[in-house]
Every structure is written in structure tokens, then in C-alpha cells.
A protein has these predicted regions:
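Class I S-adenosyl-L-methionine
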Residues: 119-175
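Glycine-rich SAM-binding Motif I of class I
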Residues: 12-16
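Short alpha-helix immediately C-terminal to the canonical SAM-binding loop
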Residues: 37-38, 120
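A short glycine-rich, Lys/Arg-flanked "PGG" loop and its adjoining helix->strand segment in the class I
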Residues: 92-106
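S-adenosyl-L-methionine
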Residues: 42-67
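Class I SAM-dependent methyltransferase core
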Residues: 6
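Conserved SAM/SAH-binding beta-strand->alpha-helix loop
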Residues: 33
Length: 175
């Protein structure tokens, strides 16, 4: 079974939906905040998807210790903290992003969603100039409801966008 990973799964809205709709994929949903993790766990106990594995952990050390190179088919990073005062902590600005890509199988994808146009624009520049990875930018339809944040932002009429980043065949990382 292909492995998919959601980083910062929150209360698990997307994780539960994705695992129910994609029984052929195993999803590991990682959430650091105890309160949100427990909410996800509780809902998972009710719904019972056998292909969903909620994990209470900080994603960075967990990814480093738990994943092998080229093991992951899809990463989801949906509405991450935009780190307004700490640009170095944004996903595509971190050296760690290279390690994340090393865990992605050839033709695997990273889905990065945000309601902040500047965050998406900066990520695009990083993909072009630093990571040299192909991507597709999409506007998220107003009817989408993958996460609690997404619902809130779209109800407010905010522009939500995502980058679907691909790992081409033969892409080399140092890890």
C-alpha cells in the first residue's frame, strides 16, 4: 500500500475524509497539539478507518526517525502556520524540506495549501529558484471543506490556493 502523510492534521477532518475516500491508501496523520490530536483520535474511533494511523508527535523528528527514502507517495501540508515573524520556519524555506522530498517516491507529490497569497508566492519562488521542482498552482474551490481552517477561510470569501509539487524521476537529494 502506498503511504500518505499529513503533517499538522489538526482535528483530523481531512485525514478522516481522505482515508474514507481512498481505502487503497494508508494515511499517517501527524498532529503535535495534544488537544487536536485527541479530537482526531476520538473521531477516528467512531469512524474506524483501518487505513488511518493518527500520530501524536512533532512532525520533523518523527519524519526523520520513521520514514525511509522514497517511501511516501503523498505529503499533505494544509494551512500550515504561516510563521509571519519567522520566515526561516516556513516549510519551503527550511533545509528540512530537502529531507522531506528525499522521503517522497518518484512522481510523488506534496500538497501545500494556504489562504495567504504571499505565502504561496514565496513558496513558488523557492520551488523555482532553490528546489527546482515542478508544481501546479490551483485555486481551491469555494465548495471545498477539507479542514476546519479551510471551511472558515472560504466562508469569509478568502482566496485559498494550493501548490501540488511533484518529484520528477531522477531528482537527487543529499539524503
Amino acid at each position: 500500500h502506498p503511504i500518505c502523510i499529513e503533517i499538522g492534521a489538526g482535528k483530523g477532518k481531512h485525514a478522516l475524509l481522505f482515508s474514507a475516500q481512498n481505502p487503497q491508501h494508508n494515511l499517517i496523520a501527524i498532529e503535535r497539539t495534544r488537544e487536536k490530536f485527541l479530537a482526531m483520535q476520538k473521531q477516528h474511533e467512531i469512524e474506524g478507518q483501518t487505513n488511518l494511523n493518527p500520530i501524536h508527535a512533532d512532525a520533523l523528528p518523527w519524519v526523520v526517525h520513521a520514514l525511509h527514502p522514497k517511501q511516501v507517495q503523498q505529503f499533505f501540508i494544509l494551512y500550515p502556520n504561516p510563521e509571519p515573524h519567522n520566515p526561516a520556519q516556513r516549510w519551503l524555506n527550511m533545509p528540512f524540506f530537502e529531507f522531506l522530498i528525499s522521503r517522497l517516491d518518484q512522481h510523488g507529490t506534496v500538497t501545500l495549501a494556504s489562504n495567504i497569497p504571499e505565502y504561496i508566492a514565496e513558496a513558488e519562488q523557492q520551488l523555482i529558484n532553490v528546489w527546482k521542482l515542478p508544481f501546479v498552482k490551483e485555486v481551491i474551490p469555494a465548495t471545498s471543506a477539507r479542514t476546519h481552517f479551510e471551511v472558515k477561510y472560504l466562508e469569509r470569501g478568502e482566496l485559498c490556493q494550493q501548490l501540488i509539487i511533484s518529484k520528477p524521476e531522477g531528482y537527487i537529494t543529499r539524503f
